[in-house]
């Protein structure tokens, strides 16, 4: 499977059957809502940088499970080098977004489960 582009990520959100409420009101077009869209844009940046030849080496890695190129956020770390690249990737995204890019907690939770199970 090819790496997802930022546009494909955003379109995948539009296809979800999601009900979103904010401040007691239902939000029909939550993907484009001005309070939600900045977070979506930050996640989209994780896909954009993976597509950019300048950052692809840092943002992507060969999967130890499939052998396919995957986004580093979905990679199961195998070495200290993987962990160092994770930190470098997070620093780069912090510089590019000046915000939380929303994927760290999920990545850390999955990696914790891998190591204890």
Where are these regions (language model features)?
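Conserved small/polar residues in nucleotide/adenosyl-binding loops
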Residues: 114-117
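Unusually extended, aromatic-enriched hydrophobic runs near protein termini
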Residues: 1-2, 62
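Short, flexible active-site-proximal loops enriched in glycine and acidic residues
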Residues: 85, 97-111
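Extended, charge-enriched "interface" segments that sit outside catalytic cores
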Residues: 32-35, 39-92
């Amino acid at each position: 499977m090819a790496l997802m582009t930022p546009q494909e990520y955003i379109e995948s959100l539009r296809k979800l059957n999601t009900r979103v409420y904010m401040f007691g009101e239902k939000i029909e077009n939550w993907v484009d809502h001005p309070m939600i869209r900045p977070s979506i844009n930050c996640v989209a940046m994780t896909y954009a940088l993976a597509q950019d030849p300048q950052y692809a080496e840092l943002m992507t890695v060969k999967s130890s499970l499939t052998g396919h190129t995957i986004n580093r956020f979905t990679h199961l770390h195998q070495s200290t080098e993987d962990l160092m690249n994770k930190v470098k990737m997070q620093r780069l995204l912090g510089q590019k977004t000046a915000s939380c890019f929303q994927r760290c907690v999920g990545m850390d939770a999955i990696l914790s489960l891998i190591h204890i199970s």
